[in-house]
């Protein structure tokens, strides 16, 4: 019984794993071409190799910029070079729509695949509709959710010959009383059925999330459509069939990717900036005397005087990254702004759970102690029963012997 209870407590800890927001260093809107650039087309299309084996929960609200991370433990692996790929999908139920895909080559075996830990990486296939809403940061999916992004995201990872799949159920708060335009998302097309609320009677900080620093209008003038994976608007004048079809989805057995994915040849840092550009260029909803500058100042003030646990997690991420190259830990996690146990995922793409691992190890120790105690108890009972049986047998033999002697004496 003790073992069962300990196992259940361990399972509850694992299934309640939480995560963090994207760190501040990913909230920018200027075009950056730092780091290693991609240099080849992907060798394979994005594929869901097997149905998801893990169910995870995630949350988002306001203008938060989030990272969905596949929690895969690579720390136990050898340093031998391996190839890897990461694919992200959105599950519409009848089909799975690919969102982003990237391949890595010659990666350090016990480090999270990234442009820094791999010899090379492919162009990124991303879903674009004139703007970049999603991109991959190492192995994580980066975006600013709208209220219509609530739903199931699926990750499919191939690490050497090992397959990892999971389902992240994202729940976006429907309160739209924030300055950013939250009326967008993957499920908004065709059937807008999510109730939005503007609850001014329940005041809360509006400057919650990512507010990139304003940039010059010509900053992106030298960036090509090809680098961002955005189709040239001029090409649509001749053939309207080139427009991406949002309903073009994957089945479990599909091995080809549809027109919803475009090949972005720019480096990872450029695509992160493109996501920030979409945030900066969206239709803002200011109230009263609010301006973008006042909102940014308020957001910084909130971070300074009322640090959220997500911000604390980001700081912990930076310190932990120097000690460890971001092992991803137990194959369970979610994004939740009030958790500070996941570290390292900001810069390395997948988070560890050092604090949570300590708790898990404690539970494992309890399971081990309980198992040993039960085994010892069983052995003790068996030995005791054996001794009692031997004693009873000896007594029976002794009585029999005395009776035999009495009969002999009578005779």
Curated annotation (Swiss-Prot):
Please name the Gene3D superfamilies in this protein's record: 2.70.230.10
Please name the InterPro entries in this protein's record: Herpes_glycop_dom (IPR002896), Ig-like_dom_sf (IPR036179)
Q: What is its main location?
A: virion
Sites where a glycan is attached:
83, 138, 222, 245, 317
Which keywords label this protein? Glycoprotein, Membrane, Signal, Transmembrane, Transmembrane helix, Viral envelope protein, Virion
A GO cellular component annotated for this chain's UniProt record is:
membrane
TM segments? Answer: 364-384
Q: Where is this region: Disordered?
A: 306-345
Which compartment or compartments is the protein found in?
Answer: Virion membrane
Q: How does it sit in the membrane?
A: Single-pass type I membrane protein
Q: Does the keyword rRNA processing apply?
A: no
Pfam families listed in its UniProt record: Herpes_glycop_D (PF01537)
Q: What family is this protein classified in? A: Belongs to the alphaherpesvirinae glycoprotein G family.
Instruction: Say what the protein does.
Output: Chemokine-binding protein that inhibits neutrophils' chemotaxis.
Q: What's the protein name?
A: Envelope glycoprotein G
Organism the protein comes from:
Equine herpesvirus 1 (strain Kentucky A) (EHV-1)
Q: Which gene encodes it?
A: gG
């Amino acid at each position: 019984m003790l073992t069962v209870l300990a196992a259940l407590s361990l399972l509850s800890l694992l299934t309640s794993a939480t995560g963090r927001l994207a760190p501040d260093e990913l909230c920018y809107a200027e075009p950056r071409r730092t780091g290693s650039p991609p240099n080849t087309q992907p060798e394979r299309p994005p594929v869901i190799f097997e149905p998801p084996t893990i169910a995870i929960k995630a949350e988002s609200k306001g203008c938060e910029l989030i990272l969905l991370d596949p929690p895969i433990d690579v720390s136990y692996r050898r340093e031998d070079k391996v190839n890897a790929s990461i694919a992200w999908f959105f599950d519409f139920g009848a089909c799975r729509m690919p969102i982003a895909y990237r391949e890595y080559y010659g990666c350090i075996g016990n480090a999270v695949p990234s442009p820094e830990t791999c010899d090379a990486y492919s162009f990124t296939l991303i879903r674009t509709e004139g703007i970049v809403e999603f991109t991959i940061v190492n192995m994580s999916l980066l975006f600013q959710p709208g209220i219509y992004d609530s739903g199931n995201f699926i990750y499919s990872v191939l690490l050497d010959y090992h397959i990892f799949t999971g389902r992240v159920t994202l729940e976006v708060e429907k309160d739209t009383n924030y300055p950013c335009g939250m009326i967008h998302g993957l499920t908004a097309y065709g059937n807008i059925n999510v109730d939005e609320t503007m609850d001014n009677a329940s005041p809360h900080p509006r400057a919650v999330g990512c507010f990139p620093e304003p940039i010059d209008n010509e900053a992106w003038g030298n960036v090509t459509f090809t680098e961002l994976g955005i189709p040239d608007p001029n090409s649509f004048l001749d053939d309207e069939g080139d427009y991406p079809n949002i309903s073009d989805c994957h089945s479990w057995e599909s091995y080809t990717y549809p027109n919803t994915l475009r090949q972005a040849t720019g480096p990872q840092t450029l695509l992160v900036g493109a996501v920030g550009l979409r945030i900066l260029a969206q239709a803002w909803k200011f109230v009263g005397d609010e301006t973008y500058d006042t909102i940014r100042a308020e957001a910084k003030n909130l971070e300074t005087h009322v640090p959220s646990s997500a911000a604390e997690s980001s700081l912990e991420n930076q310190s932990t990254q120097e000690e460890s190259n971001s092992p991803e830990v137990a194959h369970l996690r979610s994004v939740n702004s009030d958790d500070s146990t996941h570290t390292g995922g900001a810069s390395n793409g997948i988070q560890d759970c050092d604090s949570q691992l300590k708790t898990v190890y404690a539970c494992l120790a309890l399971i081990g102690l309980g198992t040993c105690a039960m085994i010892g108890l069983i052995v003790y009972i068996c030995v005791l029963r054996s001794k009692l049986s031997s004693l009873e047998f000896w007594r029976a033999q002794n009585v029999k012997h005395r009776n035999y002697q009495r009969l002999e004496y009578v005779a």
